[in-house]
Amino acid sequence: MDSNTVSSFQDILLRMSKMQLGSSSEDLNGMITQFESLKLYRDSLGEAVMRMGDLHSLQNRNGKWRGQLGQKFEEIRWLIEEVRHRLKTTENSFEQITFMQALQLLFEVEQEIRTFSFQLI
């Protein structure tokens, strides 16, 4: 994983962490789009690692991956709490469904990133 890939992933999560999670449909669609982008990136990252075949060389090329991974988990946890809060405060059924889907996607991405990180250890 080169530094551009790590930077792109970090940028996506950083933008997600700064999003204003308002109640308009545009804001909700933007949030889901960001989550879907994160999921697609996670999928492509996993495929790239499996193609490389040598996970130790991946670790050597990116010695800071553990710190960055920890930061990403913190950002995901913050997003989970933010989405949970929004889910509790909204009464609009469309928003509730959207936030529930976003929450489910965040849990899935967190679990798969965790699984991926264990493969790298």
UniProtKB/Swiss-Prot annotation:
One of its GO terms (cellular component) is host cell nucleus. Pfam families: Flu_NS2. It is found in: Virion; Host nucleus. Signal peptide: none annotated. A motif (Nuclear export signal) lies at residues 12-21, 85-94. Its main location: virion. InterPro entries: Flu_NS2. GO terms for biological process: exit of virus from host cell nucleus through nuclear pore. Keywords: Host nucleus, Host-virus interaction, Transport, Virion. The keyword Transit peptide does not apply. The keyword Mitochondrion does not apply. Gene3D superfamilies: 1.10.287.230, S15/NS1, RNA-binding. Average number present in a viral particle is estimated to be 130-200 molecules. HAMAP family: INFV_NEP (MF_04067). Mediates the nuclear export of encapsidated genomic RNAs (ribonucleoproteins, RNPs). Acts as an adapter between viral RNPs complexes and the nuclear export machinery of the cell. Possesses no intrinsic RNA-binding activity, but includes a C-terminal M1-binding domain. This domain is believed to allow recognition of RNPs bound to the protein M1. Interacts with protein M1. May interact with host nucleoporin RAB/HRB and exportin XPO1/CRM1. Belongs to the influenza viruses NEP family. This is Nuclear export protein. It comes from Influenza A virus (strain A/Aichi/2/1968 H3N2). The lineage of its organism: Viruses, Riboviria, Orthornavirae, Negarnaviricota, Polyploviricotina. The gene is NS.
